[in-house]
Design a protein with these regions (language model features):
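Short alpha-helical segments and helix-capping/turn motifs at coil-helix boundaries
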Residues: 23-25, 42-45, 104-107
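Dinucleotide-binding Rossmann-like beta1-alpha1 core, especially the glycine-rich loop
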Residues: 57-169
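Helical element adjacent to the flavin cofactor pocket in flavoenzyme catalytic cores
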Residues: 174-180
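N-terminal Rossmann-like FAD-binding beta1-loop-alpha1 element of flavoenzymes
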Residues: 10-38
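Short, glycine/serine-rich, charged loops/turns that create anion-binding
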Residues: 19, 44, 125-126
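Glycine-rich FAD pyrophosphate-binding loop
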Residues: 29-53
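A short, basic/flexible loop-to-alpha-helix module at the beginning of a structural domain
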Residues: 1-10
Length: 180
């Protein structure tokens, strides 16, 4: 880490120079422009750990493809509650970044914001059954209405050709896709 001058009494200290600290810092500055903020990063470059594309799915944790937000209960049911809460938070963050673009505080967002489909892929009968139940549970919420579910091999090849490469048509598999 390079040497830097450190304030003696900042109002806020943020640990890590990744997307979360950057976002929180910008929110705090928007709410209180005179606030003093210090960011401490142990690495030589900002956003090289969890925020780096090689270490993170880059999905913004929208709950569109993260299966851990919809665990299956012992009775086989799936609650969409946590996924809906995460998706709502994701939408609020998108609104915030859109506001920053409108205020010309973020320029050329197309250079760093890339819309890509959010996909979940599973194989095996039990996992296919789970993904179908997850999809059905999420369909009750408008944020997930545009999500697609398929067990169609050809469609999955179209959605994710590299994932499907070398797979057999006879294997049980399913996928969901959410374009954003």
């Amino acid at each position: 880490m390079s040497d830097t001058t450190i304030r003696t009494n900042p109002d806020v200290i943020l640990i890590g120079a990744g997307i979360m600290s950057a976002t929180l810092g910008v929110i705090l500055k928007e709410l209180q422009p005179n606030i003093t903020i210090e960011i401490h990063e142990r690495l030589d470059t900002a956003a090289c750990e969890s925020s780096d594309a090689w270490n993170n799915a880059g999905t913004g944790h929208s709950a569109f493809c993260e299966l851990n937000y919809t665990p299956e209960a012992a009775d086989g049911t799936i609650s969409p509650k946590k996924a809906i809460s995460i998706a709502e938070s994701f939408e609020v963050s998108r609104q915030f970044w859109a506001y920053l673009v409108q205020q010309n505080k973020v320029v050329s967002p197309e250079k760093f914001i890339k819309s890509v489909p959010h996909l979940s892929f599973v194989w095996g009968e039990k996992n296919v059954e789970y993904l179908k139940k997850r999809f059905e549970a999420l369909q009750s919420n408008p944020l997930f209405k545009e999500m697609d579910f398929t067990t169609d091999f050809s469609l999955m090849q179209e959605w994710m050709p590299l994932v499907m490469e070398g797979r057999e048509l006879t294997d049980a598999m399913a996928a969901t896709k959410m374009d954003i």
